[in-house]
């Protein structure tokens, strides 16, 4: 039998699901964080997006997966880093925030992940592993908070006459606190 297939872009599904499920009106700012993609998008309508930032190396989800692997926390990385972070102290390790002060909304997480790998070689206990997981997650949060503030400014500059009513976070890593 002949079957009818519809091509649906996975990322477009993430981008549009908030407007479908929650009756969110356009335009809105979207942070898409998944294993393969980390992007700031201004969503102006169906099939009408402008990417204003992306990761220049590892996607956020990829960094979580690799950190979970380095710390032997199991897969999938996002939920496990989250779970073990709750057992740790989030400011026990000072970790780098690459390109945090560079203009624009691009993200870089490779240097952060490399530092986690370097520090993981000297861990003496599970407690220290959980502390490093918590510090990693907290550092990612700080990076995303700073870059989101930049993205919000860019949104306001671009969409004049409309206030930023909605900031949406979508993708697998959106579940992390």
What role is predicted for each listed range?
Residues 7, 32, 171:
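Small/polar loops that bind or transfer phosphate-bearing groups
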Residues 16, 30-32, 38-42:
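Short beta-strand scaffold segments in enzyme catalytic cores
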